């Protein structure tokens, strides 16, 4: 929001919240500068000592507390009690359905899930999910608001745990855990399989368009007829997960440490951002995928 020139009021009880937010903002400005986007009119950030002060004049309120239902209930209830009547209340939850989140609220009609992806200043997707009592007006306003921020709002029309993207990621994560657990691949080898292979295809074309090409002139129907039966082969363990024993956790942690090769989390995050900037600029040059959102951002800044 601040990169779009919007003043932000925040509440975070963490004693180092200000320093963490300053670091994130510095990385965000650096990334936008690398994309050639304007950072001349960054909005202000004011940290308040209470939720009541932080939301007093807000038009959009983004709840991003830890993924504990009781914590979210108490936080959303506190926001709901003092937020302006026309404010959109959005939860960043990655898994809870909005109907389950809204049980502590007197105005559940103004709650949506608005699930972003990290780093939010470079990944444009935000999943918008309404609950049973969310008004259509709230959903429409949320879609318009996030679009005006330069994001790509995706309306998830039916409530489901974990929405769309995280359900897909969970399937890959489960299989990756099995591959490490069974000694078939290391964490680095699994990451290599993604970043040197299908990850590049996914970044610009997704799954279904990729498989449509694989179907040749017969398209998706031919692909499904040819490869559909393989879904019944015992290749995967997607409906099961290995037990997270101390041994498995140690193995993954040790392999991940080796893979990092001494780079700090900040080093890795900045490397990630540089790579994402390069990918976004390449996609923008051919008007494909998330590159379109960069084009839209330039138009919004013009």
Model-predicted regions and their roles:
Residues 37, 41-57:
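Short acidic low-complexity segments
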Residues 91-158, 162, 166:
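Rossmann-fold dinucleotide-binding core
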Residues 4, 151, 187-302:
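NAD(P)-dependent Rossmann-like dehydrogenase/reductase catalytic/cofactor-binding core
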Residues 1-34:
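NAD(P)+-binding Rossmann beta1-loop-alpha1 motif at the extreme N-terminus of oxidoreductases
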Residues 51-111:
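Rossmann-fold NAD(P) dinucleotide-binding segment
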Residues 147-171, 185-191, 205-211:
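Conserved Rossmann-fold dehydrogenase catalytic segment
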Residues 14, 135, 185-189:
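Helix N-cap / loop-to-helix initiation motif
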